[in-house]
Amino acid sequence: MQIQFHLYNTLTRTKELFRPQDQANVKMYVCGPTVYDNPHIGNSRSAAVYDLLYRILIKIFGSTAVKYIRNITDVDDKIIDRAELLGSTINELTDKVTQEFHINMEYLGCKLPSIEPKATEHIDIMIEIIERLIAKKHAYIADKHVYFNVLSAPNYTELSNRNLEEMFEGVRVENSKTKKHPQDFVLWKPAKPNESANMNFDSPWGLGRPGWHIECSAMSYKYLGENFDIHGGGADLIFPHHTNEIAQSRCAFPSSTYAKYWVHHGFLTVNGEKMSKSLGNFITVRDLMDKEISGEVIRLFLLSSHYRRPLDYNDKAIEDAKKTLDYWYRAIVNINLQKIDIIPNDFMQSLLDDMNTPLAVKIINDYARGVFTSTTEEEKKFNASNLITCANFIGLMNKTPHEWFNSGVNELYINELVNKRLEAKKQKNWLLADQIRNQLLEQQIVLEDKPDGTIWRKG
């Protein structure tokens, strides 16, 4: 039976049955980071959401049939400003931040995309598309800039579902006397005096660099062609970025529909407020790594809410994710797991229904509970195997219980204290034994006395 996968399409504002143009060549493009500063947890939500989508597509169509492109924006005004502030070269900054991004992705258990193109390596294609737009009267040259003529684009407001005036309310628009219309956006901008040569390129319109929107149109065209299946990104990109992508790509290639399914994830806040450096609540993945918050805890937190809903980062949410994973890992302690290749149907159906991760997590939790309430060894193994299979599918429970409960602790030091306590008990020195137990408890190390000795775990 054909697997049916439904996704909410921002373009049509309906949940649709996903039908790729070619089941042997499923194409997905996702907007990646602008590498000017360390990735924040908002970037991580995007990574986790589309990593899960990638896993689902692979499950349905096979790993060789799915092409996942996630770009790196390494040419941008923010990069220039940041490099000047740090006294760094452009390349030093972008290389360092890109490396940090990759470290973060590995920490969160995200699969590598099929291709991760850099904007600076595709300037020629951007120029090619801009020339097509000029030739078709959808773009014009003014004062060494090249602008896209928004009013020339059919159905410009289709993705945002708002009229033109509403779309630009509250949006910063670059004012220029050389523009034909205030809403027109830049495709190519000239180099500024004394600006870094690393951020500017030769073009038919002089030395300069591309606008942000043309970068994604060029890279998606290079690797996926005029038409592809899925385009992903945050809801904040619907306008202007994705709206402008659609306009310029469809105008450059008139027979193109560009992306068929537009999949957007919701906003991420911190303690109920928008994340910003001015509010002092700007949290990077590196901040969480330095606090020794497990990548699996962060990933479960990111997937705990439906991807289209807002998600709030707070200490309780992280603590809840940690407790949930502790519960799951505790369920498989001392169980000889049976490897199963079949994913339980109820779990898979939850993900096939617009990636309903809250329901998927509930189902995993039910399997964990089933382990503890099982009355037979066979039933216990069944629940434990389904637990680990489902959790693995969404990128969780990739450690043994021992690794999980003892991560980030000095095992030699703890074993010495456990042996010292054991000796104290033999000497009937109950006061010292209790002191050692309490000392370890303060370090979140829990002792369990068994007939054959004492075992410990991180609480």
Curated annotation (Swiss-Prot):
Catalytic activity: tRNA(Cys) + L-cysteine + ATP = L-cysteinyl-tRNA(Cys) + AMP + diphosphate
Record-level Gene Ontology MF annotations: ATP binding; cysteine-tRNA ligase activity; zinc ion binding
Cofactor binding, note field: Binds 1 zinc ion per subunit.
Cofactors (names): Zn(2+)
Main location: cytoplasm
UniProt GO cellular component terms: cytosol
InterPro entries cross-referenced by the UniProt entry: Cys-tRNA-ligase, Cys-tRNA-synt_Ia_DALR, Cys-tRNA/MSH_ligase, Rossmann-like_a/b/a_fold, tRNA-synt_1_cat_dom, tRNAsynth_Ia_anticodon-bd
Disulfide bonds: none
UniProt-listed Gene3D superfamilies: Cysteine-tRNA ligase, C-terminal anti-codon recognition domain, HUPs
Localization of this protein: Cytoplasm
Domain of life, source organism: Bacteria
One GO BP: cysteinyl-tRNA aminoacylation
EC number: 6.1.1.16
Keywords associated with the record: Aminoacyl-tRNA synthetase, ATP-binding, Cytoplasm, Ligase, Metal-binding, Nucleotide-binding, Protein biosynthesis, Zinc
Motif ('KMSKS' region): 274-278
Residue numbers binding ATP: K277
Sequence motif: 'HIGH' region, positions: 33-43
One Pfam family named in its UniProt record: tRNA-synt_1e
Ligand binding (Zn(2+)): C31, C216, H241, E245
Quaternary data: Monomer.
PANTHER family in the record: CYSTEINE--TRNA LIGASE, CYTOPLASMIC, CYSTEINYL-TRNA SYNTHETASE
Assigned protein family: Belongs to the class-I aminoacyl-tRNA synthetase family.
Name of this chain's protein: Cysteine--tRNA ligase
